Amino acid sequence: MKNYFLFTFLFFGSSIWATNSSKTMMSSVKNRFVRTAAGPTGKVSIVIDKSDYELSVYDNLGWYATYPVVFGNNSLGDKKMQGDKNTPEGHFTIIAKRVHPKWCRFISLNYPNEESREKFAQRKRRGEIPSNASIGGGIGIHGTWPHDDYLIDRYNNWTEGCISMKNEDVIDLYRYVTNGTEVTIHK
């Protein structure tokens, strides 16, 4: 009987410890990291890494902050046409910012730009997409529905091609990005 209790304690105790340990490790990846609360210094730029699910901010001193993000399609492929739910890759700029009734804040990117139009035309010429396909638009960085930040924690890609952040993170980013801020998106 003693062996049974010892086995039960060791088995369940180690399971609980392993579960709690992995949650701690995962949560550190899902939180934002900021160099200083004072805000960025000088010109700001953004680099979004689709493979790592990260949006990083750089200023005149170098790295400033990294935020967890999610995208559209789980394939993480480059946007080919409207409706494919992929997030475009390339070099963009912020063209507008607004408070959004559904997604907290919306930071608009200049998609499609010349670079994305050229990739779209090449794909049409090669027959990779239908000849009547549209390039799409309305791509930006935004928050989630109220109380849906867990989508970011779970790396649940849910957008139509935009970049989604936790609401508190998009509010933070919104404070210091301006029209003309450069945004690079890559895999």
Where do the language-model regions lie?
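Sec-dependent N-terminal signal peptides
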Residues: 4-12
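N-terminal post-signal-peptidase region of extra-cytosolic proteins
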Residues: 28-45, 50-51, 71-95, 123-127, ...
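Extracytoplasmic
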Residues: 41-43, 50-52, 64, 87-89, ...
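Short polar/acidic secondary-structure junctions
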Residues: 60-61, 97-99
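Short Gly/aromatic-enriched secondary-structure transition segments
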Residues: 62-74
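Exported/periplasmic cell-wall-interacting domains
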Residues: 99-187
